Amino acid sequence: VDDTQAHQPQEAHEPDEAHEPDRPCPAHAGSTGSGAPRHYLTTTIPYVNSRPHLGFALELVQADVLARHHRRLGHRVRLLTGTDENSLKNVLAAESLGVPVRELVDRNADAFAALHGPLSLSPDDFLRTSSDPRHRPGVERLWRACAANGDLYRKHYAGLYCVGCEQFWSEEELDGGRCPEHGTEPHLVVEENWFFRLSRYAERLHALVTSGRLRVEPEARRNEVLAFIASGLRDFPVSRSRERARGWGVPVPDDPGQVVYVWWDALGNYITALDYATDGAAYRTWWEGGDRRVHHVGKGVVRFHAVHWPAILLSAGLPLPTDVLVHGYLTADGRKISKSAGGGAADPVELVGRYGTDAVRWWLLREVPRTGDVDFTEERLAARYDTDLANGVGNLVSRTVAMVHRYRDGAVPQAPLPDCAAVAACGEVAVQVSEALDAFDLRRATGAVLRVVEEANRYVESVRPWELARAEGGGDRRAGGRLDESLAVLVHCCRTLGRELAPFLPDGAARIAARCAGSTLAPPVPLFPRLSGPGGGG
């Protein structure tokens, strides 16, 4: 695979793009044009020792929602994802399979890039650390900048290393002598490496996180970072011997016997993808000139992103991220879903094949709490889809369209909207979604959208359009006017759902918008067919 051809960076999404469903929406307050806020959003980059699992799909979908939301506000957005290919665990995985490392990383990197279609993701760039020509020179430049600041030095070291998470652990950090992330016993590594003077930055990092200039959400993760800093920061190794790395990775500048430690290499992707090596226009626009630089990360790597990475940037004299948004883990039977666990239930592409993109995205956004982990089962996925989308959103839209056809031959009444709870919910939802997403609370954001469904259903049961139609048929002209009003309210609610669901369910939202567009509606068709149980649904 020639990565320079397979994954060319796209132009970042600009606010005047007209593609559905991320176009700027008048219902949301937001700047447009060249002076619009610039949001640079990133995911972590996964190791490619195996194929993707549902746990990483969670992070991709969350970041995609934020990107689509900001585009809809008229903001300029660049969303980066990619793959972390210069790790020892990739080398060991290739050895265990008896294949060249290049063959393994190419094959699995393609599998990660292929998630974008099934999950309806909208990244602007995809960087592969082993083959993208932007990456290595950027890593080298970052190394030299920290060296020039006096923050890199060599020393002999002995430490307990977990290959699974590619990091050293102190004995106090281990859980019964095992890695707290992987449950495996780390092995002793003794060699001479380059170290970074992390201890030099403890006070500055503490001040940045405490003040909110480096925002870590949710609060529990911020407190965890502050406690880690307060416990005393130790300098950490940033290289490994070329021999232990099997010759795979980025050589340390001016020291060919050492390879850059995978975490330094991987963290650098956030700026190397912007042509940091050459001070490119993308770097100046999105990192130096960006209004927000947002990292989406899992809880297991928050220290690297909220402590190690900012310290490296401080050393190099570069701008820091503005936000580190931290999610929990997906578990299966109480155990973290990971590539090593295997199993089809953890494969996002297989899940999409069985249940559809809307079902998978919705479960990840609706079920996962702001803080903590959640256990995944296919039964829970199907039940959540049926409850919220088939019986909720889909049923409301289908019911509304059917009544417009039954009572008005498909023509949407042009009646003024009354002062009622359903209309009020439509007017409030945009702000509620924005506030929830700004707090990185996707469950609250999706709940705000579902409130429109709840109020619309209450409205239907209150006004009972079928009784108004019966009265109109008996000659009651006032009932006919109220029927027009009620149908106008319900169509308004459905159109609001099509708009507000767009960041969360781009495919489903587009179907709703198309079904409810225009002055005359097309006949009803199921938008979210039920996955299980009896009955129809939307």
Indicate where each model-derived feature is located.
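A glycine-rich, aromatic-flanked flexible loop/lid motif
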Residues: 364-370, 396-407, 416-429, 448-463
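Short secondary-structure capping/junction motifs at helix and strand boundaries
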Residues: 119-127, 147-160, 172-173, 187-189, ...
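Basic, alpha-helical terminal appendages of large translation-related enzymes
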Residues: 1-7, 20-38, 78, 82, ...
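Structured secondary-structure scaffolds
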Residues: 25-28, 33-73, 77-81, 136-138, ...
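N-terminal Rossmann-like or analogous alpha/beta NTP/dinucleotide-binding catalytic cores
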Residues: 2-3, 25-152, 163-166
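Cys/His-rich short segments
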Residues: 148-206
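Long, non-coiled-coil amphipathic alpha-helical linker/lever segments
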Residues: 430-443
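Aromatic-residue-lined binding/catalytic grooves and analogous aromatic/hydrophobic interfacial grooves
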Residues: 402, 409, 442-443, 499
